[in-house]
């Protein structure tokens, strides 16, 4: 391929790429949390088809099917989850956006509330490509309701 053709193709690719500013990334991340909380199937419109996901105890997955597989792991136990949008801290950096916050909800008949109970604090690391989410790594303790307390000996008088 000639140099001129290579340059023309590179320019065309660059034109087709959607460059997001920090506010765009924050808007997409907020939309992700709202759609997730509502269980909306159109959440996938925010992701690349080959998007990478990481969730504790699930590990890494790739693509929409992996995202569904991760969500199905909560079937029968997660009654609801609501992220506390006003608690979010956004830290943009290049193609990345880090979102730290809290959630509240109910699982297996027990409630949790981030900042008040052991479970419910999270930190998500999003990577964006071409205007969509290319990866999301979700960092949290999936023991939302504190069922695993016996293995940790810090006592009950902790600040959440």
Regions found by a protein language model. Name each.
Residues 109-112, 144-152:
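A short, polar/proline- and glycine-enriched secondary-structure boundary/capping micro-motif
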Residues 121-149:
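Short beta-strand edge/turn micro-motifs at domain boundaries
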Residues 83-85, 117-123:
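Short, surface-exposed coil-to-beta transition loops
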Residues 29-32, 42-44, 51, 63, ...:
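Hydrophobic pocket/interface hotspot
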Residues 24, 41-94:
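A solvent-exposed, acidic/Ser-Thr-rich amphipathic alpha-helical stretch
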Residues 2-49, 154-160:
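Short, low-complexity N-terminal intrinsically disordered segments enriched in polar/charged residues
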């Amino acid at each position: 391929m000639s140099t001129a053709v290579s340059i023309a193709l590179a320019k065309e690719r660059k034109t087709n790429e959607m460059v997001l500013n920090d506010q765009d990334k924050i808007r997409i991340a907020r939309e992700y949390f709202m759609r997730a909380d509502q269980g909306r199937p159109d959440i996938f419109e925010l992701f690349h088809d080959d998007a990478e996901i990481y969730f504790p105890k699930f590990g890494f997955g790739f693509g929409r099917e992996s995202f569904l597989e991760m969500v199905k792991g909560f079937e029968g136990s997660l009654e609801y989850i609501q992220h506390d949008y006003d608690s979010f801290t956004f830290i943009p950096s290049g193609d990345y956006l880090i979102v730290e916050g809290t959630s509240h909800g109910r699982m297996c008949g027990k409630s949790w509330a981030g900042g008040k109970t052991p479970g419910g604090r999270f930190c998500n690391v999003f990577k964006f490509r071409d205007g969509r989410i290319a990866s999301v790594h979700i960092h949290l303790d999936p023991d939302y309701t504190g069922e695993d307390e016996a293995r940790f000996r810090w006592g009950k008088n902790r600040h959440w």
